[in-house]
Structures are given as C-alpha cells and as structure tokens.
Amino acid sequence: MPLYRKLLGVSAAAALTASVTRARREARRRAIELGAPFGVLPTLPTGQAQRVGVVYNPSKPGAAAAVEILERILAANGHPQALVRTTRVDEPGSEAARELIAEGVDLLIAAGGDGTVRAVAAALAHHEGRKPRLGILPMGTGNLLARNLYIPVSDVAACVNIALNGAGQAVDAIEMTTTSAPGEETEHTFFVMSGAGFDALVMNDTNEEIKAKFGWVAYVQSGMKHMLGRSHPVRISVDGAPFRTLPMRSVLIANCGRLQGGIRLADMTDVHDGNLEVIVASPRDLVEWGLLMAKVTRRTILGSPRVELPVIRHLVGSEVVLEFPDGAQPVEVDGDPAPSAHRISARVLPAAVEVAVHPEVL
C-alpha cells in the first residue's frame, strides 16, 4: 500500500477516535447536567470544613429557600454557618462579594440569575491576592455560565453538593469597554457572551412579565419582532490585525457558546482556553435566517464540524475592537442591557476565576 494511503488511513482513524471521544465526553457532561433531578447524579464525598460566603438575589423566586437548603447541608456536614449577603437594586453583588472575600471565605456562592453570578464572579476576577472558589446556585432564566459548566440548574441540592465538594475549573473572564460618545466609556466584565445589534435589541425589548411566566419563550417573542431589520457595517480588528468591514445584524463576543436547551452558538472557544470568539451574523431575510438556524442546530445536535456560511462568520483571538460607522448600536452584556456604543474593545483575562464543577465535567 502506498505511503500516502497509509497516512490518510491513520489520519482518518485519529479523526474518528477524536470525534467519538468528544461525543462521549459531551454525553457524560449532559448526563450530569440533566440527570441530577432524577437521582442519577451521586452525592460527592464530603470534603473538609470550609468558610462559606453567599451572595443571593432576594427578588429571585426560590433564592431564599435555596440558601436555607444550603445552610441545612452545611450544618449536617460540619461546616461553619454561612456568611450571607443580599443584592440590592443599586448593588448587583460585587460589593457584597468583595466584603466576603475580605472576610476570608474559602467558598463564595452566587445564588441568583446571570446578573448576580456575573457581579460576584467579576469581583473575584479583579481581586488581587488569594481568591476563594466560586460556587453557583442558578436561579435565573438563562443561567448561562452554569449551563456552560454543566451545573444542574434545576436541582438546588445537587448544586450545593457540587459547590461544596466539586473540583475546581479555571474560567476566563472577558474585560470589555464600550464607548458611547467621546470620553464616555463604560467598563464591563463578563463570562459568557455579549453583543451588539439584533441580539441586544431582543434582550432589551423582552417583556419582563412573559419572561417571569414562561422563561426563554419571551426571547423568541422579542426576536420575531426584530427579525427583519436592516444590516449595518461593523469594522473588526482581532489581535491587532488591520480592520476589516463586514455587514452585520448582530455581532457577538463569546467566552463560551452554550445557550438554553444546549444550543451551541460559539464553536471555536471554551471557557478556559484563553480565547474569545467573535460571531458576525448578517441574515437579510427569512431564508437566510433559516440557513443560520440550520447551521446552529446541526452543530448542536450532531456536533458537526464548523461549516462556513455567508450569513455567519467566526473569528477567534484574545482581544478584539469593534467600530460601528453608522452610529451607536444597542449592547447587551451576558443578557443584561448596557449603554449603546459606537465602539467596543474586549480582551481575555485568562483563568480569572476558579468555579466549582462536578469532577466528571473536567
């Protein structure tokens, strides 16, 4: 057999093995995420006693009850009583987190929605010196960081067990600056995904009553309303490269890519690889929206290799600058509204936070 055929055979076998390994790993992670409510996820062995701090959002249904469950588990396993702080309308959790870090807690738990988790994690990311591990009790609609770490969002006891006894996963942060006008800059730190254009319109125009009753369905309703808007140019520079101009309906900066329902939007980056992914979507009509959705669905269900389409482009690097020549675009940060901007810059902060996850996820 010619050498080139042998090499092709070896390459094909290696690719198949890698694909099967990835599929098995993803299936195991999904089993952890989905199996906990049905008793499939075994309780992890109890570790040594820890000083636990909790920041929770009292406006979230079930948050206070979750803290009570946490305190019962702590008492039953010989841990000291938790130090508990609440968020406020004018203080989403960063200040409370800094207080608990100063108290010297070993584990800092964020109990709330994506905003609370982001605020607590951001305080950890920017802390100089010893950092406690972050635990997550997801109580929101999206719970996106928890989903990307395969934390079982519907089982409080399992989340507490993972927070107390899980393994540590290093997670990158993304530091982003939005410029609304000359001299008007806003700093943000996020951990999942932020964007400008269509997705920000959807997030900013979501009906809160529908969201409270039906969860992510509210985003679908808002998305249908804004689906057929016009494109705008965006100038993009990744890692200091020359600017390139692309049409866009939406541009996203992603630290990781799983959304509700396991949908994977970003497919070139992960939470701990030191990179961010820029996704530029430019569908002009219902047919092109269909192509975009088909690509995302194929990737989500089949784990298919990335397929380039004219309506969606992916760029990867450690920093990016976006400029909008047509004027300021609406912006969202991990699903929360932010000031509109005509310029956005972002860079990765590698391994900024250590998050407690189930050991099988690593």
Residue ranges and their predicted role:
Residues 2-108:
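ATP/NTP phosphate-donor binding region
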Residues 2-24, 35-40, 238-245, 264, ...:
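ATP/nucleoside-binding phosphotransfer catalytic cores, i.e., glycine-rich phosphate-binding loops
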Residues 16, 183, 187-195, 201, ...:
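Short hydrophobic-aromatic micro-motifs
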Residues 50, 132, 318:
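Nucleotide donor/acceptor-binding cores
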Residues 76, 230-275:
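Oxyanion-binding "anion nests"
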Residues 87, 126-250:
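Catalytic core of DAGKc-family lipid kinases
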Residues 110-115:
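N-terminal glycine-rich "phosphate-gripper" loop used for MgATP/nucleotide binding
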Residues 116-129:
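Short Gly/Thr/Asp-enriched flexible loops that form oxyanion-binding sites at enzyme active sites
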